[in-house]
Amino acid sequence: MPSASASRKSQEKPREIMDAAEDYAKERYGISSMIQSQEKPDRVLVRVRDLTIQKADEVVWVRARVHTSRAKGKQCFLVLRQQQFNVQALVAVGDHASKQMVKFAANINKESIVDVEGVVRKVNQKIGSCTQQDVELHVQKIYVISLAEPRLPLQLDDAVRPEAEGEEEGRATVNQDTRLDNRVIDLRTSTSQAVFRLQSGICHLFRETLINKGFVEIQTPKIISAASEGGANVFTVSYFKNNAYLAQSPQLYKQMCICADFEKVFSIGPVFRAEDSNTHRHLTEFVGLDIEMAFNYHYHEVMEEIADTMVQIFKGLQERFQTEIQTVNKQFPCEPFKFLEPTLRLEYCEALAMLREAGVEMGDEDDLSTPNEKLLGHLVKEKYDTDFYILDKYPLAVRPFYTMPDPRNPKQSNSYDMFMRGEEILSGAQRIHDPQLLTERALHHGIDLEKIKAYIDSFRFGAPPHAGGGIGLERVTMLFLGLHNVRQTSMFPRDPKRLTP
């Protein structure tokens, strides 16, 4: 006589067979084998952003991440996310889906990547929680392409929740260190996607505008033999049997290109600052947008060209990236960025007068501190209703050695900074193009002439008057969007305390 245990097993096996037999949809779902480029199936994947009413009743394939899943009786609702776009998908028991398929879909780990075949259906009521609000996908097949681990280091819904909402409702938000420690997950949020797509737009508009103005894009060395601006804030690297340094800017090389008759040049590339500054706006590595240009008679020719380039960038962002701006504003509310045409220009002495009138004590040759920059930004906004402006004629004492002195006032210089929302985003000037004066200024700053010999020599064979400036990409992105920390606009930020990921 068979044992009770054996009897139970003999009963369970037919039930399993029966269940399997009843699962008429078993070929329509599951975990796919790893894609190793074995084949190229005749299948067209549709972008989630293209799932609109125009595709109603079409059968489509979509590859996306499982953002959320919610089982309800004999059906399961999924939100499928692809970059910053998402769509609701419905898996319901019927001709194409068995109860086992519904259960499988409901238990797919969040952030897993799936291939879904479904029919695009128009919905009677807009789906407010999705970007594709007028349609949903009725799933006929679903296969897991890449399975995410069940425990995520952070929840994406928490990562996009406005801080004010989290505080008021006692709901979770994600702090900065957690975001940066798990940057790959954080970059998947709609806010991060919008920030870095807009940042890409800044680079594109910068390049597009300058090429249209007749500029040539150049690439300059990042490993150099001496501190590029004569300062101590450089990273030292081993260079065979000698020391070399990471460039603080492409400054000296873009000037040498002007001496080589390129006339108008720009570059986009990394710059390095060994400054132990743990502030909201400093990084040890960031992307520099640099410009240098020969002029005819006055450095304002260059200053105005740079200002116009910035205005073209602002216009382009507002015209082409409204969706991204609105996405960021949803989590980080901010007033729209304002600018004037032509750009407001104030002399440094005028800025000092405004600050002194507001109660700030400053000497004529003092540099602006960060709090005073912010205060000046508020004063300028109140008086002129602009977030973007230029300060001209800085004190010579606070500028680099290659800055041209003002011929009318030896304590001033032919230099300027540009500001967004009360924070400096560009520092620029007319450069000294006379080798004798350049040598004198370098010695005044205590710079070893031997280490910048090639730079000074480039001016000995005839050099046109020229000027330029350097812009911090991450700062421009941060300030245009009204964000509060430059680490939000650096994809993988580097600061004195962070070297990974």
From Swiss-Prot:
It comes from the Eukaryota. ATP binds at R273, A274, E275, R281, H282, L283, E424, G472, L473, E474, R475. The modification Phosphothreonine is found at T52, T500. GO terms for molecular function: aminoacylase activity; aspartate-tRNA ligase activity; ATP binding; RNA binding. Its main location: cytoplasm. Keywords: Acetylation, Aminoacyl-tRNA synthetase, ATP-binding, Cytoplasm, Disease variant, Ligase, Nucleotide-binding, Phosphoprotein, Protein biosynthesis. One of its GO terms (biological process) is protein-containing complex assembly. The keyword Disulfide bond does not apply. Expression in the developing and adult brain shows similar patterns. Highly expressed in the ventricular and subventricular zones, including hippocampal subfields, the midlateral temporal cortex and the frontal polar cortex. The cerebellum, cerebral cortex, hippocampus, and lateral ventricle show preferential neuronal expression. Expression in the peripheral neurons is evident in the colon. InterPro entries: Aa-tRNA-synt_II, aa-tRNA-synth_II, aa-tRNA-synth_II/BPL/LPL, Asp-tRNA_synthase_2, Asp/Asn-tRNA-synth_IIb, NA-bd_OB-fold, NA-bd_OB_tRNA. It is found in: Cytoplasm, Cytosol. Residues 411-415 are annotated as: Binding site for the 3'-end of tRNA. Residues 251-254 are annotated as: Aspartate. Pfam families: tRNA-synt_2, tRNA_anti-codon. The modification N6-acetyllysine is found at K74, K374. The modification Phosphoserine is found at S249. L-aspartate binds at E229, R273, S427, R431. It catalyses: tRNA(Asp) + L-aspartate + ATP = L-aspartyl-tRNA(Asp) + AMP + diphosphate. It is linked to Hypomyelination with brainstem and spinal cord involvement and leg spasticity: An autosomal recessive leukoencephalopathy characterized by onset in the first year of life of severe spasticity, mainly affecting the lower limbs and resulting in an inability to achieve independent ambulation. Affected individuals show delayed motor development and nystagmus; some may have mild intellectual disability. Brain MRI shows hypomyelination and white matter lesions in the cerebrum, brainstem, cerebellum, and spinal cord. HAMAP family: Asp_tRNA_synth_type2. Belongs to the class-II aminoacyl-tRNA synthetase family. Type 2 subfamily. Catalyzes the specific attachment of an amino acid to its cognate tRNA in a 2 step reaction: the amino acid (AA) is first activated by ATP to form AA-AMP and then transferred to the acceptor end of the tRNA. PANTHER family: ASPARTATE--TRNA LIGASE, CYTOPLASMIC, ASPARTYL-TRNA SYNTHETASE. Homodimer. Part of a multisubunit complex that groups tRNA ligases for Arg (RARS1), Asp (DARS1), Gln (QARS1), Ile (IARS1), Leu (LARS1), Lys (KARS1), Met (MARS1) the bifunctional ligase for Glu and Pro (EPRS1) and the auxiliary subunits AIMP1/p43, AIMP2/p38 and EEF1E1/p18. This is Aspartate--tRNA ligase, cytoplasmic.
